[in-house]
């Protein structure tokens, strides 16, 4: 029982420690696409930890289902596809 009460404090300390980390640098000039994809390790880890804490804590309210924010979710545009000609019919009038 005592171990469970110390868990939030340990996770908070871990969050602060991860917040000060930096991602290992990629060689400059190697690949511009890789430079765009670089992730700040501290930011990613902190966000994952925050999501874990929100979903695992019963004291803070209801446990919310994970949000669907992927690239194939409703409302996203298909950037690779051609524009739909039927949707452009109103321009011809």
UniProtKB/Swiss-Prot annotation:
Residues 64-93 are annotated as: Disordered. Residues 83-93 have a biased composition (Basic and acidic residues). InterPro entries: Calcitonin-like, Calcitonin/adrenomedullin, Calcitonin_CS, Calcitonin_peptide-like, IAPP. The keyword Transferase does not apply. The modification Tyrosine amide is found at residue 74. Residues 24-35, 78-93 form a propeptide. GO terms for molecular function: hormone activity; identical protein binding; receptor ligand activity. It holds the Pfam family Calc_CGRP_IAPP. Can form homodimers. Interacts with IDE and INS. Interaction with INS inhibits homodimerization and fibril formation. The mature protein is largely unstructured in the absence of a cognate ligand, but contrary to the human protein, it does not easily form fibrillar aggregates. Belongs to the calcitonin family. Amylin/IAPP is a glucoregulatory peptide hormone that plays an important role in the regulation of energy homeostasis. Selectively inhibits insulin-stimulated glucose utilization and glycogen deposition in muscle, while not affecting adipocyte glucose metabolism. IAPP function is mediated by the CALCR-RAMPs (AMYRs) receptor complexes. Amylin can also bind CALCR receptor in the absence of RAMPs, although it is more selective for AMYRs. This is Islet amyloid polypeptide.
